[in-house]
Amino acid sequence: MSLVMAVVCTDGIVVSGDFRKTEFKVNPQTGEKRIIGFSDDSHKLIRTKSDRIIGHTGYNKLNNGELVDTVIQNAILLSETLKLSIYDEFRYLISCIRDGQNSLIEVGIENSQKIVLVWECGDKEISVNQQGGAIGDTEAFKKYISAFEKERENRVTEDAIALLQKYNHLIANETPTISPECEIMVIQ
């Protein structure tokens, strides 16, 4: 798993994504997956030409063998050609990866509104947030959520960068599926 978090700030939106990729070996007789290691070289954030940020967690390949990054990039190209709204783009992205084991988050500013859209694997509905959101290994994040919510209020993007790095590191200390370092992207 991984962790992607977004915070809506007074002057923009900040998104963090860890780098951890979990490596599995599949037992050919049972189909059971076993963790064999980790690598910290996987980028989970993509900035679009329309200045939106898309984050994803889950497997790097869909059930049909396609790479998730390739599917997302192709969906973005179509979305930009058609000039889709953030909501329509997100719905299209979900339709492209729905059969995999992935979750998505997309942030952007549209009509002066700061928007965070979240879809967890298996959800029927999209969550629309005004404050922020998280996808991935959010179970480990739950113990920090009340402190995080207090610290998050009325932040500017510069402060939110340090806040997301701090919580990413804290959560990484509790679960091996999250790297202690994370990449940051900002929309203003």
Residue ranges and their predicted role:
Residues 1-188:
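N-terminal nucleophile
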